[in-house]
């Protein structure tokens, strides 16, 4: 499920990433399951009231149906964080922008433009 969010997702790279995630107690993995199938997944690390999205992926058949947004909503609602950060490329930038993330930096990685984004938790004052 996570392969679409990984650059050059070889079996070895995916296995190494899974081992890295299992070894870090600050990393959380949550999936969105519907009708017995996982439709989306988010991997994130929490530290000092901030969550960093390491991977987020939604089954292509279910993209555009709000699953990615619900995964981010879950992080804000279930963890004591007031900010979420993520690094992404052109493929997912529109998703983050639509959710409300803003670009705080850009960089090149393997000649691919990367966007460092953040989203501050919205406070309801009504």
Question: Each predicted region: which residue ranges?
Answer:
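Short amphipathic alpha-helix that is part of the acyltransferase structural core
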Residues: 1-16, 33
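Conserved acetyl-CoA-binding loop-helix of GNAT-fold acetyltransferases
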Residues: 58, 64-77
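Conserved active-site alpha-helix within GNAT-family acetyltransferase domains
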Residues: 90-113
């Amino acid at each position: 499920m996570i392969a679409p969010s990984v650059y050059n997702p070889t079996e070895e790279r995916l296995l190494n990433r899974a081992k890295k995630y299992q070894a870090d107690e600050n990393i959380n993995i949550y999936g969105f399951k519907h009708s017995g199938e996982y439709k989306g997944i988010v991997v994130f690390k929490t530290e000092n009231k901030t969550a960093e999205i390491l991977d987020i992926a939604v089954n292509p058949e279910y993209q555009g149906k709000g699953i990615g947004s619900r995964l981010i909503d879950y992080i804000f609602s279930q963890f004591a964080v007031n900010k979420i950060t993520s690094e992404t490329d052109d493929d997912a930038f529109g998703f983050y922008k639509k959710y409300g993330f803003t670009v705080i930096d850009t960089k090149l990685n393997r000649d691919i433009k990367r966007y460092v984004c953040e989203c501050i938790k919205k406070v309801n004052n009504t």
